[in-house]
Swiss-Prot record:
Assigned protein family: Belongs to the universal ribosomal protein uS9 family.
NCBIfam families xrefs: PRK00132.1
InterPro entries: Ribosomal_Su5_D2-typ_SF, Ribosomal_uS9, Ribosomal_uS9_bac/plastid, Ribosomal_uS9_CS, Ribsml_uS5_D2-typ_fold_subgr
GO biological process: translation
Protein name: Small ribosomal subunit protein uS9
GO cellular component: cytosolic small ribosomal subunit
Region entry Disordered, spans: 1-29
The keyword Ribosomal protein belongs to this UniProt entry's keyword annotation: yes
Keywords for this protein: Ribonucleoprotein, Ribosomal protein
Stored PANTHER family: RIBOSOMAL PROTEIN S9 (PTHR21569), SMALL RIBOSOMAL SUBUNIT PROTEIN US9M (PTHR21569:SF1)
Compositional bias of kind Polar residues: 1-20
Single GO MF annotation: RNA binding
Organism: Rhodopseudomonas palustris (strain BisB5)
Gene coding for it: rpsI
């Protein structure tokens, strides 16, 4: 600011413009699919979404077959429901590692990221719902001198 101000009216004219929030662009491959990876615990999911009837395929199987528990299927649908896009996209994903709960969380994270790649304007809704945040909680390692991560061996006073 090399100039000096004569009055407070000039203050607004001298303010430098702050850079706007980053703009996100639509990222789609040649087949019209958006791709993203999701992670949770030890599970890693690769997710592709494309406009369709709402069919979800996990490791080349129907979602009802792969995730038999209704809670896990509900977890996968959460980002689509929050974005009001349930039944509008076909989801194809491959998931490996971890257990079923971690895999469902990884697929949910991947669907959320793929939705933002397909429709960047949904980023605010999904971020507010916590779907774009990677859940960094993993199993605590076992320590030597202990039975498990924190549990000590049985202690006898006498």
């Amino acid at each position: 600011m090399s100039e000096t101000m004569q009055s407070l009216d000039q203050l607004s004219a001298l303010k430098t413009t702050q850079p706007d929030a980053p703009t996100y662009t639509k990222k789609v491959d040649k087949q019209g699919r958006a791709y993203a990876t999701g992670k949770r615990k030890d599970a890693v999911a690769r997710v592709w979404i494309k406009p369709g009837a709402g069919k979800v395929t996990v490791n080349a199987r129907e979602v009802e077959v792969y995730f038999a528990r209704p809670v896990l299927r509900m977890m996968i649908q959460q980002p689509l429901v929050a974005a009001a896009r349930a039944g509008q996209y076909d989801v194809i994903c491959t998931v490996a590692g971890g257990g079923l709960s971690g895999q469902a969380g990884a697929v949910r994270h991947g669907i959320s990221k793929a939705l933002t790649n397909f429709e960047p304007e949904l980023r605010g809704v999904l971020k507010k719902g916590g779907f774009l945040t990677r859940d960094s909680r993993v199993v605590e390692r076992k320590k030597y001198g202990k039975a498990k991560a924190r549990r000590s061996f049985q202690f006898s006073k006498r």
